[in-house]
């Protein structure tokens, strides 16, 4: 455990951010199975704006979602 006050605060902040990021990512995964296309794309875009995922990964996720759901609807 860190002894410096600012280090202790940074540990707390990074843990809080990690938990928030995990929640957002798991919510996106859940949406990909249960929600509509618009809801999925909106959640992915919000995650990019919050800095949770990189924009290139967001594009890949949207593309993967499109491919999997275009096959299932045919």
UniProtKB/Swiss-Prot annotation:
Described function:
Binds directly to 16S ribosomal RNA.
Q: Which SUPFAM superfamilies match?
A: Ribosomal protein S20
Q: Keyword set for this entry?
A: Chloroplast, Plastid, Ribonucleoprotein, Ribosomal protein, RNA-binding, rRNA-binding
Cellular location(s): Plastid, Chloroplast
Q: Which InterPro entries match?
A: Ribosomal_bS20 (IPR002583), Ribosomal_bS20_sf (IPR036510)
Q: What is the lineage of its organism?
A: Eukaryota, Rhodophyta, Bangiophyceae, Cyanidiales, Cyanidiaceae
Highest taxon listed in the record's lineage: Eukaryota
Family under the similarity heading: Belongs to the bacterial ribosomal protein bS20 family.
State one molecular function term (GO): structural constituent of ribosome
Q: Please list the GO biological process terms of this entry.
A: translation
The cellular component terms of Gene Ontology attached to this UniProt record, alphabetical and capped at eight, are: chloroplast; cytosol; small ribosomal subunit
Report what the protein is called: Small ribosomal subunit protein bS20c
